[in-house]
């Protein structure tokens, strides 16, 4: 089965992307990455201390992973662009996850500023994956701006509430012909499986793994869930019906 995910010219086999925040200790991150099978790992640039090898988050991310810095902390397009440029200048490559958040309570993304940042960074050669509220018109604008994918939230960051925006995400999947990667709010493996069954191209998970009792085992559970959900989607889910329908004939065999 030819089922490749291509982003920015890179073939990505694992459809589970992972974040690196909130872990009880950075030293477990390599094991988490290994058990998850993830190829794409995101990290906030503000958590990278380039002057300290011990505290430098990059030390714990396997070298064969695609590093995707994010612009966490940016409150507007200007700040997001500045962080992205700093990440590339620091050797973190061209992949960038745009996060523009000016709302301190719910941490919801500012789609307008995100679109502005995407337009600028795409012109500068970045491979831009913007985190967004799942709005169809804004997703189209991000695509037109050159985004390599869109990353709609399932629920507010860090809440583990699952796919509260399920119907809106499904609209993006149906209408946008660039990858749709569900990001934020995924709280358990079944949430990730559900997103993949909907037809999402990938999911990004951080809090649900990092705050689990055993993050390494949870990473493996998420990996299995993503694979199962993708296979279910590709296989074609059976129709949902209003009334019961017997799987075997109910008449004729007692004559």
From Swiss-Prot:
It catalyses: [ThiS sulfur-carrier protein]-C-terminal-Gly-aminoethanethioate + 2-iminoacetate + 1-deoxy-D-xylulose 5-phosphate = [ThiS sulfur-carrier protein]-C-terminal Gly-Gly + 2-[(2R,5Z)-2-carboxy-4-methylthiazol-5(2H)-ylidene]ethyl phosphate + 2 H2O + H(+). Transmembrane segments: none annotated. It holds the Pfam family ThiG. One of its GO terms (molecular function) is thiazole synthase activity. It is found in: Cytoplasm. InterPro entries: Aldolase_TIM, Thiazole_synthase_ThiG, ThiG. Keywords: Cytoplasm, Schiff base, Thiamine biosynthesis, Transferase. Its EC number is 2.8.1.10. Pathway: Cofactor biosynthesis; thiamine diphosphate biosynthesis. GO terms for cellular component: cytoplasm. Homotetramer. Forms heterodimers with either ThiH or ThiS. Catalyzes the rearrangement of 1-deoxy-D-xylulose 5-phosphate (DXP) to produce the thiazole phosphate moiety of thiamine. Sulfur is provided by the thiocarboxylate moiety of the carrier protein ThiS. In vitro, sulfur can be provided by H(2)S. This is Thiazole synthase.
